[in-house]
Design a protein with these regions (language model features):
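Short beta-strand/strand-turn micro-motif
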Residues: 1-62, 88-131, 337
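Hydrophobic packing positions in regular secondary-structure scaffolds
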Residues: 66-70, 77-84, 88, 92-100, ...
C-alpha cells in the first residue's frame, strides 16, 4: 500500500473515509479550502453518511493507493463547520469555468491536482483538458483511440494555480478588486475576450471588479452585442464611472447600438455638457468623418509659451493618444498650426507656440467621407487628423486607432464573415 503525496481530487471524491479504528465515517462529499496564503489550502471536509452531511476536520489524514484502490485514513476527527473559507472544491470549482491567465481564455475545470506541502494539503493545479474528462469518466482508452485517430498527442493539460483565476464568489466579504486581481493584469482586449465567454452574472462580477480606467478601456474592446447586457446589469454608480472615463465619441457609438432601458440608463448618467456633445455627434451620417471623430483634443492659442503649455498638459493629464499633437488656433478657433510633443519638450520654455509650430497642417472637413481621413493619415503619417467645420474652425480630431477600430476592422470582419 503506497501513501500518496500528490493525487487528483476526483480520485478521492465519494470514497469512504476511515477513522483510526477502521470504522467508516462516511463518503467524501466536498472539501473546504482557503486561499489566504495563495494556494487553496484544505481546512475541512464535508462527509456524507446515511443521507446526512457532516463537517469534519482531521488531525491526520492520509491518502493511499492499495493496488489501484484509493483509501482515505484519518486520526483525530472532530465535527466542525469552518466559519471562513474561500471555496468548496466540488460546489465552487469542479466543472465550473475558470480563467486561464496565460492562455487568456475561459476553460472548464475537469479535475484538481492536490499535493501535500509542509504537512498540509493544497490545490496546486487545475486539470482543464479533455484528457482529464476521459479519465474522470473511466473512458481513458476510448479517449486515447480518438486522439490517435485525429493525430493529436494524448496529454494532460494542467494549469498551475498561480496561472488561473476562479470566477466563483464564495466569500462575500472579499473585495471585488482583490478577487479578480490576476485578470486585471491582462490587456483590455484579452479581458474583453474573456468576458464574452462568460454568462451575464460572471460577466457583471468581473467587469465591476475592474478599476475605472481599465473598465472603460475593456468596454471599448467588447463586441457591440454584449455591451447592452453589461450596461443593463451595472449599478448606477459603476455606470456613471464608466461613462466618465469614456470619450463622448465612444458614448455616441455606444448609444447607436443600444435601445430602450439600456439607452435611457446611459443618457440619465451623462452630464449636461456631455449629453449635448454626444447628441451633436449622433447627428452625423455613418461613414462621415464626424461620426468617428472625438472632441477630446488639445488646442491652445498662438501666444501661449512652451513653459505654459507644459504646465497645462500636467494639469490636464490627457490620454497619451491625444497629447502627441497640440493644435494651435487663433481667436476664432481656426487651425493655424500644430506642435509635436517632442518639439515642445526640446524647445526653450519662453518662446511661443507660433514660433515652433508647423503651419503646413492637413485637415479634413467634418462632413467628408472617412476614406479622406484615411488617405491623409496614411499620406502624412499622422496619428490624428484635425477635423474642421465649414468655417475651418477646429471641432475635433480623428485618431488613427479609431479609424482602425470603428471603420476598417468592422469592414474586415464583415468581409471575412461573408
Amino acid at each position: 500500500m503506497k501513501r500518496l503525496s500528490v493525487f487528483l481530487y476526483t480520485d478521492i471524491l465519494s470514497k469512504n473515509i476511515y477513522d483510526e479504528f477502521g470504522d467508516v465515517l462516511g463518503q467524501l462529499k466536498d472539501i473546504y479550502v482557503t486561499t489566504d496564503d495563495g494556494y487553496p489550502r484544505v481546512i475541512g471536509y464535508q462527509v456524507k453518511k446515511n443521507g446526512m452531511t457532516l463537517h469534519y476536520e482531521f488531525r491526520i489524514i492520509n491518502v493511499f493507493d492499495d493496488n489501484g484502490k484509493i483509501l482515505i485514513k484519518t486520526k483525530g476527527s472532530s465535527e466542525i463547520l469552518p466559519r471562513t473559507y474561500t471555496y468548496l472544491l466540488s460546489k465552487n470549482l469542479l466543472d465550473k469555468k475558470i480563467v486561464d491567465i496565460n492562455g487568456k481564455q475561459v476553460v472548464r475545470v475537469n479535475d484538481l491536482r492536490i499535493s501535500e506541502i509542509a504537512g498540509e494539503y493544497k490545490v496546486i493545479a487545475v486539470e482543464a483538458g479533455p484528457v482529464a474528462k476521459f479519465r474522470r469518466y473511466g473512458i481513458a482508452p476510448f479517449g486515447k483511440l480518438i486522439f490517435k485517430m485525429i493525430r493529436k498527442n494524448y496529454e494532460d493539460k494542467a494549469l498551475m494555480w498561480e496561472d488561473v483565476e476562479s470566477l466563483e464568489m464564495v466569500n462575500n466579504n472579499l473585495q471585488l478588486s482583490q478577487s479578480y486581481k490576476k485578470i486585471s493584469t491582462l490587456h483590455p482586449a484579452d479581458i474583453a475576450d474573456i468576458l464574452e465567454d462568460l454568462d451575464y452574472t460572471e460577466r457583471k462580477q468581473v467587469f465591476e471588479s475592474l478599476d475605472e480606467d481599465l473598465a472603460a478601456e475593456t468596454f471599448e474592446e467588447i463586441e457591440d452585442e454584449y455591451k447592452g447586457s453589461i450596461i443593463k446589469e451595472l449599478s448606477e454608480t459603476k455606470t456613471a464611472e464608466l461613462l466618465e472615463n469614456m470619450g463622448n465619441d465612444e458614448i455616441a457609438d455606444l448609444l447607436e447600438e443600444l435601445e430602450g432601458e439600456e439607452r435611457d440608463k446611459v443618457l440619465v448618467n451623462l452630464e449636461k455638457d456631455d449629453a449635448e456633445e454626444v447628441e451633436e455627434l449622433l447627428k452625423y451620417e455613418d461613414e462621415t468623418v464626424g461620426s468617428i471623430m472625438t472632441k477630446d483634443f488639445i488646442s491652445l492659442g498662438l501666444n501661449v509659451t512652451v513653459e505654459e503649455t507644459i504646465d497645462i498638459l500636467k494639469e490636464m493629464d490627457p490620454d497619451e493618444d491625444v497629447m502627441y499633437y497640440i493644435y494651435v488656433t487663433d481667436e476664432e478657433d481656426r487651425v493655424k498650426g500644430i506642435v509635436v510633443l517632442r518639439d515642445l519638450l526640446l524647445s526653450d520654455g519662453k518662446i511661443s507656440l507660433k514660433d515652433i509650430m508647423e503651419d503646413n497642417i492637413s485637415t479634413v472637413n467634418h462632413d467628408a467621407p472617412i476614406a479622406e481621413a484615411i488617405e491623409k493619415s496614411a499620406k502624412y503619417d499622422l496619428l490624428s487628423t484635425a477635423v474642421v467645420d465649414d468655417e475651418h474652425r477646429l471641432i475635433g480630431i480623428v485618431l488613427i486607432h479609431d479609424i482602425v477600430d470603428e471603420y476598417l476592422y468592422p469592414l474586415w470582419k464583415k468581409k471575412n464573415k461573408n
